[in-house]
Amino acid sequence: MSSVHTSPPGPAFSSGANAGPLPAFPKETEIPVFKTTTKQLPDIPIPSALSFYYAGISSIWLWYRAPLDVLRAYVEPLGMTPYDFGGGQGAVNINFFNAVCFYGSGQPGNQGLGGFNETEINVMAYATKVAANVPSGLTLEQYLISGDPTKRIGNYRVWVACDDPVAVACGIQVFMENKFLVGYDYDIPGANNSRSGPDQFTYNWACVDTTGAEIYKAQLKLDGLSCVPGNMSEVIDLSYDKTSRRPVGSRRNYLGLFDTYLQPAVSSSVQLKYGKSENPMRHDMENVIGTSKPVAIQMYKSPTCIAEAAGYYADL
């Protein structure tokens, strides 16, 4: 497979000084920027559905090993057990993603489109009551390449940090997530954010709480790394229903394979730093991950559906 996700090179801009086929394109495009203030109005009810559909997503998973004794404290009181990937070690991941969805209804001032960014802090676990039916002996590498065929091992979402209030509300009410509102500052390669060296394969993102204090930030550099396909979908997400006191699973179908990076160099490709926020997610990240080095990286990017090229003189 290709070594890394690639973005197309920037266009060869024409100076307009020749009689070639391309108009003079600006090297930069100026766009309007608004500072907005909002006043929350009363909540409104909307129909619920048994499935939620993403129109597009760019997702990154940073995988770490963690002692089972540490992970048990997070899941055993909720009727779940951390999966043993060998050597008394379980696994956790940081899943940062950018997503967009179509709501199918819009009005002036409401485009009917939703874009949101999230971080999930996940512990790999399963419902304790089905322990006899959970496959044993899987290594983390096997899991990341082939997944769990029984789909009983899943991501228990210790925290979900999201920058969209609607997504926060739906995550809590429909999917029973431990979800809360944050902000993000990020710059990642993509089809509309092409890069030249040396940062062509560098991903940066930071998560801040509602006071502006940083919870964590990460930098990922994929230069020189090669990936193998990972058959992870469908991914099982685990939550906890406080009313019935039972673990709850939901199935997230990514319609494609994951790019999975497993080389030893992965350990030096990520810089993870914690901020000064007093948010409990920061404290839990330090507790379960701390200064550990990642052992794997996974990525999934949904395919672009339309590519529109720049204009040219059509009368030549």
Where are these regions (language model features)?
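Interaction-surface and assembly-scaffold signal
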Residues: 3-46, 157-316
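N-terminal ordered "arm"
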Residues: 38-40, 45-98
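Generic detector of ordered, mature protein regions
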Residues: 73-79, 84, 88, 105-110, ...
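Aromatic- and glycine-enriched beta-alpha-beta binding-site module
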Residues: 97-211
